[in-house]
């Protein structure tokens, strides 16, 4: 849960500093069976060193569920839970790409979506500030 708190605090920081330009992006898996639309600010990403994030090489941003829309592939998703079973890691059954996950924000009331920014179309990762998170020690 500390990871989600860190991610949400990063979003609050963006709002406080007035740098919260929202834009819609399309994303999905490699084979195209899972596709979604997200609305977010691409200023910051989180690189976590926990076991699953290190193995899959994700760069993450967390958004409220209201800013996420699954366009197709709901039946193509496999859910993977581990450790405390708080975050649903969804991956495509066909190509294996994990392009997003869902979990409950700290406080237990709002669902947030973790977007793997590497799965979004038309973005330049070189323009994004990457913030390190020590999930390995949690």
Q: Which stretches of residues belong to each language-model region?
A:
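A short Gly-Trp-Pro
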Residues: 13-28, 33-138
């Amino acid at each position: 849960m500390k990871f989600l708190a860190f991610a949400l605090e990063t979003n609050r920081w963006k709002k406080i500093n007035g740098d919260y330009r929202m834009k819609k992006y399309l994303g999905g898996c490699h084979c195209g069976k899972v596709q979604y639309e997200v609305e977010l600010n691409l200023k910051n990403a989180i690189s976590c060193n926990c076991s699953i994030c290190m193995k899959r090489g994700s760069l993450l941003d967390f958004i409220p569920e209201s800013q996420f829309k699954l366009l197709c592939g709901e039946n193509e998703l496999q859910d993977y839970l581990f450790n405390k079973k708080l975050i649903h890691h969804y991956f495509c059954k066909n190509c294996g790409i994990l392009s997003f996950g869902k979990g409950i924000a700290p406080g237990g009331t709002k669902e947030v979506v973790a977007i793997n920014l590497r799965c979004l179309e038309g973005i330049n990762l070189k323009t994004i500030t990457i913030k390190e998170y020590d999930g390995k020690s949690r």
